[in-house]
């Protein structure tokens, strides 16, 4: 009697060389970098030449793993990381992601002036009114 078992890949993001990370604390907060080398359980070596992140060892508590990865040899130099980053189109993929769009929207809303916030409120009221009107017709 044979039973077929299905091997399924994990859904969580693994700490691996070539994984793109978003730095959430420190001097380079909000910038993207790639994991170049895993130092130990809590630290990795990152490099982000396109985003202006210097090559540095960073604690995993200071970064967020993104779903983006690209092929990168272990311990790659900055020039290699830069070439592979550009070839994989990481910046374009990140800009197209809903995560990046949400961050951009949050920054845009934080930068609104009082009058712009008022305009947003008026537009939301207009939208709500048209929806109510359409529901009343139906």
Curated annotation (Swiss-Prot):
Task: Name the GO terms of the biological process aspect.
Answer: cytoplasmic translation; maturation of LSU-rRNA; ribosomal large subunit assembly; ribosomal large subunit biogenesis
Q: Would you indicate the residue range of the signal peptide?
A: none
- Which Gene3D superfamilies has this protein been placed in? 2.30.30.30, 6.10.250.2270
The organism's place on the tree of life at top rank: Eukaryota
- Cite the InterPro entries for this sequence: KOW (IPR005824), Rib_uL2_dom2 (IPR014722), Ribosomal_eL14 (IPR039660), Ribosomal_eL14_dom (IPR002784), Translation_prot_SH3-like_sf (IPR008991)
Keyword DNA damage listed: no
GO terms (molecular function) for this protein are: RNA binding; structural constituent of ribosome
What GO terms fall under cellular component here?
cytosol; cytosolic large ribosomal subunit; nucleolus
Q: Which residues carry this modification: N-acetylserine?
A: 2
Q: Where in the cell is it found?
A: Cytoplasm
Any idea which UniProt keywords this protein has? Acetylation, Cytoplasm, Ribonucleoprotein, Ribosomal protein
Please give the family membership noted in the entry. Answer: Belongs to the eukaryotic ribosomal protein eL14 family.
**Protein name, per record:** Large ribosomal subunit protein eL14B
- Say which species the protein is native to: Saccharomyces cerevisiae (strain ATCC 204508 / S288c) (Baker's yeast)
The organism's taxonomic lineage, starting at the top: Eukaryota, Fungi, Dikarya, Ascomycota, Saccharomycotina
Name of the gene: RPL14B
